[in-house]
């Protein structure tokens, strides 16, 4: 890695740490410069705005959610089980995705947030495409799914999943009142049902074979947002 690339990554790492610990809105470019003892010229040589930093951080996080090749090969799951697991892991309501959700909470619904969300969704789709396509191919071979257009079907499936988590995020973050978390989670699970049915129909998968999100995933997302709001 050349010197300029190293500096660029160091800025990203520092910004991510500060955004996570202090919050995106509470962290200024000057805070990042002070932390690194860096000049403004050096910063702006790599990034135009703080928003550009957030966008790149989130895209990197999306790329890291995809499974490692050795993990995939070691898994004893069949195609349908893989598909269920992959679609679940794409949704940023657990693991690496929770850090993304926490960082983007303050700007989730404004122009910056929507741009970051689009970048994250695009990066997710690019990172997960080969795995979703492979799982679908396994489903077809095993008889648990069918389509004449596997590549297009995989693309549409990922678009549905990306739309789902953004819709749920809008519901959770945009809520002006704090319901009991269990009640909120139950209501949100109902909103998942049309997406689940659409995905099963798209792949000709058995009814009820895809789960997408568990109740605990929704509760974790609600807790993260409530923590930010409080």
Language model: regions and residue ranges:
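Short coil/turn segments at alpha/beta junctions that flank glycine-rich nucleotide-binding fingerprints
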Residues: 21-25, 76, 142
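Helix-turn-helix
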Residues: 10, 18-52, 56
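Hydrophobic alpha-helical connector segments
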Residues: 56, 70-100, 150-157, 192
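Short secondary-structure transition hinges
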Residues: 95-134, 141-155, 181-182
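C-terminal peripheral helix-coil segments that are non-catalytic and often amphipathic
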Residues: 126, 130-137, 141, 166-230
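Generic hydrophobic, amphipathic alpha-helix propensity
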Residues: 7-15, 32, 57-61, 65, ...
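Hydrophobic/aromatic residues within well-ordered alpha-helical segments
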Residues: 50, 61, 65, 90, ...
């Amino acid at each position: 890695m050349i010197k300029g690339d190293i500096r660029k990554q160091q800025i990203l790492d520092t910004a991510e740490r500060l955004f996570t610990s202090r919050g995106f809105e509470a962290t200024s470019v000057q805070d990042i410069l002070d932390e690194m003892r860096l000049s403004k010229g050096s910063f702006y040589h790599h990034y135009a705005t703080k928003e550009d930093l957030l966008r790149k951080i989130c895209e990197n996080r999306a790329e890291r959610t995809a499974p490692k090749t050795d993990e995939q090969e070691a898994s004893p799951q069949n195609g349908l089980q893989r598909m269920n697991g992959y679609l679940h892991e794409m949704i940023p309501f657990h693991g690496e995705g929770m850090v993304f959700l926490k960082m983007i909470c303050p700007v989730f619904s404004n122009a910056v947030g929507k741009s970051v969300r689009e970048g994250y969704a695009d990066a997710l789709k690019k990172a997960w495409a080969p795995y979703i396509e492979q799982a679908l191919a396994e489903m077809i071979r095993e008889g648990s799914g069918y389509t004449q257009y596997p590549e297009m079907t995989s693309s549409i499936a990922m678009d549905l999943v990306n739309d789902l988590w953004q819709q749920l995020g809008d519901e959770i973050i945009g809520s002006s009142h704090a319901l009991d978390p269990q009640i909120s989670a139950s209501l949100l699970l109902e909103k998942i049902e049309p997406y689940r049915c659409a995905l099963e129909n798209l792949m000709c998968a058995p009814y009820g074979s895809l789960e997408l999100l568990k109740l605990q995933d929704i509760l974790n997302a609600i807790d993260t947002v409530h923590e930010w709001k409080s």
